[in-house]
């Protein structure tokens, strides 16, 4: 239905918190929670928590970020669905140039984060990392985010990573920025 399409579109466009989805769709929060629950059960959306979130935090409906699980679905609802009239009218070139091309690097960066996590999971299974991690995901607090954090069971060893899908080369400045984020994580 149009309600579900609006919710999926909102999430695909980067509105990943419950309140952001509510603001974008203007759906009453109590009803929105039911729709989101249905989309989670169908596997269309998933809910992501900071890698350091405990079970109590994960049980809180207000916590976590929603994400479209399938990259094709995510692309469709981010670029095709909101522009379907123009595309049906034959303006694929204009939509690509003025909509898709402008957002493609940002969109692809989220997909690249998933690819990087998959790569680390594979390396972990093959025991090719300095330690075996038991948990991997993104870490965030109210002001900062780390794209990848992997920790061992004892939480004594950690891998941090920033996933940059961009034209420019990663440099020392990027490394120092990640090191500063590591110190933020150590405070929590």
What kind of feature is each model-predicted range?
Residues 1-73:
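Interdomain hinge/linker elements that couple catalytic modules in large macromolecular machines
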Residues 60-188:
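A cross-kingdom feature that marks ATP-driven nucleic-acid transaction machinery
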